[in-house]
Amino acid sequence: MSRAVILRNAQIAADIYELSVQFEGTLPPVQPGQFAHVKLPGPTPMLLRRPLGINHVLAELDVLTLVYQLRGQGTRALSALEKGYFLDILAPLGRGFSLPDGAKTAAVVGGGIGAAPLRAVLEAWPQVPMDSFLGFRCGAASYQLSSFARASRELRLCTDDGSLGRQGYVTDLLAEAMEHNAYDVVFACGPTPMLKALQRLMRGRGIPVQVSLEERMGCGIGGCLVCNCKVKYGEDWRYRRVCADGPVFDLMEVELDG
């Protein structure tokens, strides 16, 4: 475990917060798609840590930026913490995204809070032109658009209600782009309905699709088996631990209905 001091903890969109922390010790190398496991405060400290996606890294300053959504008592307690408060954080954890050998172009597909870890993908490999396709519930729920725009070759947006970008689904934006652009890899994170639609869209195209799964976790290091997911293994299926074997998997090998 490591102590990290809060540098900033601010609301950046509807129910979305950005948390920047600086570690007391040297931050290990971070792979995009890895996560931080944060112990939450309280009169009686909450038993389970919360997994938060790593959004931005300043390695030279040992600083991580995490983005989280208000979902319950734990994240509400976290949102009340102020600059200078010390947190107990395990990071970086898990297996992140990887850039395939020879990849010259990429697409980034994110939905809601799932867009957060994809900023780290864009910033990790600036030499690879990447187009970003982001979907949100509404304009008020969108965040960090200027950061995504700076790091992307092109940024396309959609919302459920049409208040920002096009009204519709982010996978429709990707489908249209693929009529004119060839991508060597797709990086994705978002809600299950979005991932199912992405599976249908990409099946049979021969393009690798790496997905970061969002699951509640217990230990965060693979010991408790709380965060299992079903993954194709040859002609069979096996259960894998999202925290240790993932959170990044081959989307075409993940059973999203299980």
Predicted regions and their residues:
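FNR/FR-type flavoprotein reductase catalytic core
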Residues: 73-216
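Nucleotide-activated chemistry modules centered on ATP-dependent adenylation/adenylyltransferase
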Residues: 201, 221-222, 247-258
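Ferredoxin-reductase
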Residues: 2-83
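Short, charged beta-turn/beta-strand-edge "cap" motif at the junction between a beta-strand
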Residues: 41-45, 91-96, 233
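Structural signal for conserved beta-strand scaffold positions within catalytic alpha/beta enzyme cores
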Residues: 8, 56, 157-159, 211, ...
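Local cysteine-cluster metal-coordination motifs and their immediate loop/turn environment
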Residues: 117, 192-193, 214-247
